[in-house]
Amino acid sequence: MHHLHPMIVCIFVMYTGIVGSDAIAGDQLLNIGVIQSKIRSLMYYTDGGASFIVVKLLPNLPPSNGTCNITSLDAYNVTLFKLLTPLIENLSKISTVTDTKTRQKRFAGVVVGLAALGVATAAQITAAVAIVKANANAAAINNLASSIQSTNKAVSDVIDASRTIATAVQAIQDHINGAIVNGITSASCRAHDALIGSILNLYLTELTTIFHNQITNPALTPLSIQALRILLGSTLPIVIESKLNTNLNTAELLSSGLLTGQIISISPMYMQMLIQINVPTFIMQPGAKVIDLIAISANHKLQEVVVQVPNRILEYANELQNYPANDCVVTPNSVFCRYNEGSPIPESQYQCLRGNLNSCTFTPIIGNFLKRFAFANGVLYANCKSLLCRCADPPHVVSQDDTQGISIIDIKRCSEMMLDTFSFRITSTFNATYVTDFSMINANIVHLSPLDLSNQINSINKSLKSAEDWIADSNFFANQARTAKTLYSLSAIALILSVITLVVVGLLIAYIIKLVSQIHQFRSLAATTMFHRENPAFFSKNNHGNIYGIS
């Protein structure tokens, strides 16, 4: 029984153009400056299976009857081996099974050399595990490489013993087939050698560009769709269409960036590279439309206003939701999301989008406002009350009635339009119904606080000037503080010196007083001694009890 490849289960309706909707009143919203710029389908995606592509990096040359020696091929082989050697060594380090006696980390039953990964995220470790798993099937991969080595077809599907589908891609074989095979017998060997060398050198340059980041660590840096496009060349769309088996437009898938590749293994013997292509699983939400809205300023009682509406909405089952799509991938025709980002909108805004313009909320604009015109679907939408709208072909000035919110200018009205200094070539006819009976003057408009851009700018300038003044005052006080601090320091030093001086003077005075006292004592002692010497009889009689010294 034939096994279908489990890589992708996709439910998709081919995008053929989405017409106007019933939930959003696009024609009526034009009166207040709301334009539907783009309508896209809503797609959900999740991680899917993987497909494997074998890239043959060396072409097969047709036989030359033994008369030609193609030296450029040998040089290419040597250079290519040098280029791929770091990749081969790195893949070997990641996939090497650590000895059971040493410390190991196991993921999904395989052993990953974590030292080769360094600091890795969960996704990067998952990629490394994929490399290890692929190397566990090295025998099947080698058999696969051998089976495609002799073919010179650009794309050939082969199935290994495990019934795993892989695609052998020889990106440069197309060049070889077209440039060499038909003329191998009619030109000189040197010319063929030079031609082959130029082709191989160009491809080497592309390979160097592709594998610049992978040389560091292929497990941590997946191949982008741009790298895959360079690597697989013109065969990429064929590979995708044959392998994905889906109605999803190939260009749409490629532009989404959701298709990535991972280098799994390299065969040095055959110079073949095994790449794992990761393709998400897609499913479309039937009947859902993601609509981009552009709101330009409109005229209301000779005042410039802008309506408050979301930038992007989701229309589904006659309901409207705000849909920013911040975590989604937006392509020209689809929005790819992992989950629904829709959120409710206010009732007044909902009624406004449904066509009840009296429920719309506007913000007055004072000053310059850049969103005064929009160019969508080949038609110009402009607020010609706030802009000078001049038609260059045929020459005339476009006037806008006071009751009209905006002016809609198609090719019937003007083929080349001048808005101030901008020039637009109008290419389409406006075929929607413009509700001319709606008057902005009679509308029951709910105003928010005015958005005065000029005053806001002046306020900002005043704040900046005030900040500069405060900074200048701060610097002045800081300088004053530094000056005062200096004076305080000098005063403190002077005070300390004064105290020291007073202490020294006090000590000197005390010393002088003590010295004078000692001098007085010395003088008294000297006088007593002198009197004793001059009157010895007095002291002798006195010593016997006769105080007067008379016998």
Swiss-Prot record:
Stored Gene3D superfamilies: 1.20.5.300, 6.10.10.110, Head and neck region of the ectodomain of NDV fusion glycoprotein, Newcastle disease virus like domain
Localization, UniProt: Virion membrane; Host cell membrane
Domain of life: Viruses
Keyword Translocase among UniProt keywords: no
Modification after translation: The inactive precursor F0 is glycosylated and proteolytically cleaved into F1 and F2 to be functionally active. The cleavage is mediated by cellular proteases during the transport and maturation of the polypeptide.
Site keyed Cleavage: positions: 106-107
Disulfide bonds: 68-189, 328-337, 352-360, 384-389, 391-414
Signal peptide from the UniProt entry: 1-23
Segments crossing the lipid bilayer: 493-513
Single biological process term from Gene Ontology: fusion of virus membrane with host plasma membrane
Cytoplasmic side, ranges: 514-551
Extracellular topological segments: 24-492
Coiled-coil stretches: 132-160, 456-481
Keyword Transmembrane assigned: yes
Glycosylation sites: 65, 69, 77, 90, 431, 461
A GO-annotated cellular component: host cell plasma membrane
Summary of subunit composition and partner proteins: Homotrimer of disulfide-linked F1-F2.
Protein name, as recorded: Fusion glycoprotein F0
